[in-house]
From Swiss-Prot:
Belongs to the UDP-glycosyltransferase family. The keyword Transferase applies. UDP-alpha-D-glucose binds at T150, A350, Q352, H367, W370, N371, S372, E375, E391, Q392. An anthocyanidin binds at H17, A390. This is Flavonol 3-O-glucosyltransferase UGT71C4. It comes from the Eukaryota.
Length: 479
């Protein structure tokens, strides 16, 4: 009987994915003392040159979490592939790294088997984009493999839909059919095609999805960063699905400590928090589009005009398009800061978690990244949806149409090729968010309470995580 165990986590080299992998690792270690060590395999990629430094900063005070850096491969996929089809880039990166990953896992397993302690490697926890490793590493080394879905359960429903659709239509999605409604499993409503992830409309990225989607069925189990109370419909769907692995709702998995931007100084944080301290409760709208979300100068000017028109208090984190770091004030309309003096603050980086937790924040104009979505729900802050990339349109559709927890600003922003969102559109959404959303605000607050209860002893996510841990040790006892 195995008394203690080790897990090996394999995230893709992206800060958002690394963050939630490490947060989940911390939770597992805190929940069960029999989990002796969790090793994070850190892949090297030109697309995320600071991934290792970032990961080390997250585990600095965690002696039971180890980082195992893999050496850079000699022939990474071309970087222009990452820029035009990031899903295809990541899938190719994992394939090229597979021999290194297999060697590293083999070495860890061998060291445990040859050691004097009773610790054994119980399994692999793989990022959704690493699911080829279920067969190529897990099965080869006789290790149970679990896929960790860093997005929501409806995304898993989309992955279930793709192979069925591909058998009928063996090509990428077509934007000219944007209003065609798709019967995606796990959704209450049929989804207009235009709200699907933009990669599905790109031939190279679509081929990556077609590779990834069927492999979920090969896993021992699927861990989802969501919770039953937020997504009862898809979790119920998967619980009744035959010939499919068990799905564990283990979220929300959050980091409630802010990660500073490399260029951020303490004075920026102090200025932002100090300004918020002086604002009335729930009076400020926060605009922030994530680490990769940016807008061009004409769009900045439309947002500025809308904020002037609405007249509400605001905190606006600006990242402009382009390779050169721009001072936010350089792209604002002339005289804007003078006209909004006292009721608006513009910054580059913002401490998002601390901002969303602040009593002054009454609404969040967001890109709808899943980490940001969970943070806003955790702190009971309603959202206006402005998706920018990846699966964010699907998240926006979920929040607005499926759950009634958000205001639609422009749910199909990516599908509409980033066309200019007008001052009037933005103003309408901000007004609805700040002035007309009492019922929505109440629903979001109720979901914040549900998120906390899910993580308590006896809560839905706590019980699901316990089932996952029990399965690990059951497998380990038969090794």
């Amino acid at each position: 009987m195995v008394k203690e165990t080790e897990l090996i986590f394999i995230p893709v080299p992206s800060t958002g994915h690394i963050l939630v992998h490490i947060e989940f690792a911390k939770r597992l270690i805190n929940l069960d003392h029999r989990i002796h060590t969790i090793t994070i395999l850190n892949l090297s990629s030109p697309s995320s040159p600071h991934a290792s430094v970032f990961a080390r900063s997250l585990i600095a005070s965690q002696p039971k979490i180890r980082l195992h850096d893999l050496p850079p491969i000699q022939d990474p996929p071309p970087f222009d592939l990452y820029q035009r089809a990031p899903e295809a880039y990541i899938v190719k990166l994992i394939k090229k790294n597979t021999p290194l990953i297999k060697d590293a896992v083999s070495s860890i397993v061998a060291s445990r088997r040859g050691g004097s302690d009773s610790v054994q490697v119980a399994g692999l926890v793989l990022d959704l984009f690493c699911n080829s490793l279920v067969k190529d590493v897990g099965n080869e080394l006789n290790l149970p493999s679990y896929i960790y879905l860093t997005c929501n359960a409806r995304y898993l429903g989309m992955m279930k839909y793709i192979p069925d659709r591909h058998r009928k239509i063996a090509s990428e999605f077509d934007l000219s059919s944007g209003d065609e409604e798709l019967p995606v499993p796990g959704f209450i409503n049929a989804i207009p095609t235009k709200f699907m992830p933009p990669g599905l409309f790109n031939k190279e990225a679509y081929e990556a999805y077609v590779e990834l989607a069927p492999r979920f069925a090969d896993a021992k189990g699927i861990l989802v960063n969501s919770f039953t109370e937020l997504e009862p419909h898809p979790f119920d769907y998967f619980s009744h699905l035959e010939k499919f692995p068990p799905v564990y709702p283990v979220g929300p998995i959050l980091s409630l400590k802010d990660r500073a931007s490399p260029n951020e100084e303490a004075v920026d944080r102090d200025q932002i928090v100090g300004w918020l301290d002086d604002q009335p409760e729930s009076s400020v709208v926060f605009l922030c589009f994530g680490s990769r979300g940016s807008v061009d100068e004409p769009q900045v000017k439309e947002i500025a005009r809308a904020l002037e028109l609405v007249g509400c208090r605001f905190l606006w984190s600006i990242r402009t398009s382009g390779d050169v770091e721009t001072n936010p004030n350089d792209v604002l309309p002339e005289g804007f800061m003078g006209r909004v003096a006292g009721r608006g603050l513009v910054c580059g980086w913002a401490p998002q978690v601390e901002v969303l937790a602040h009593k002054a924040i009454g609404g969040f104009v967001s890109h709808c990244g899943w980490n940001s979505t969970l943070e806003s729900l955790w702190f009971g802050v309603p959202v206006a949806t402005w998706p920018m990339y990846a699966e964010q349109q699907l998240n926006a559709f979920t929040l607005v149409k499926e759950l009634g927890l958000a205001v639609d600003l422009r749910m199909d922003y990516v599908s509409s090729r980033g066309g200019l969102v007008t001052c009037d559109e933005i103003a309408r959404a901000v007004r609805s968010l700040m002035d007309g959303g009492d019922e929505k605000r109440k629903k979001v607050k109720e979901m914040a309470d549900a998120a906390r209860k899910a993580l308590m002893d006896g809560g839905s996510s706590s019980l699901a995580t316990a089932r996952f841990i029990a399965e690990l040790f059951e497998d380990g006892s038969s090794c």
